[in-house]
Amino acid sequence: TDDDLERVRAEVTALRRARRTARLAARLADAIEPTFFVRGMRGLDPEGVIRTLGARLIAAGAVDASYVDGAVERERMSSTAFSDHLAVPHAMTMSARRTAIAIAIDQTAIDWAGTPVHVVALIAFADSGRAEFQEVFDQFVEAFSERDNVLRLVRGATDYTGLVSELARLMEAAG
């Protein structure tokens, strides 16, 4: 019947969405290690947040100190706040040893060059794998274009598992 056909279509759509979300979560987990997640950044200015996140990337061998210095310098040239809630600092070069994302989240916004920011994602781009990661990055930024998405992430990402699963859901819906 038509109702049966519609139920099957809905199930197939739900299954495809679940698979896409799982693939996206796996890609995010590759780029965001548990130690790359910081809950809270109060009292820090943009440079302090970049250096805090950068130290975690350095400790994991994803970048060296010059990459973090480059991200700080890039931020001084022009704010990397993408929206009223997200900043995405990064260096001008793709000199990271591997592509990685370190994320800080705080329920209280910090002042990011005049923009209130709840989420900071320090992106480390490696030359290898850049094209593959570009899709993930585009969806990441798109997911944060909606204020409600940012607030949902801020509430839901209380630990690493919550961060990755919430990000994957938001990005899947955005992409």
Language-model regions, residue ranges each:
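Cytosolic covalent-transfer regions centered on His/Cys nucleophiles
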Residues: 1-175
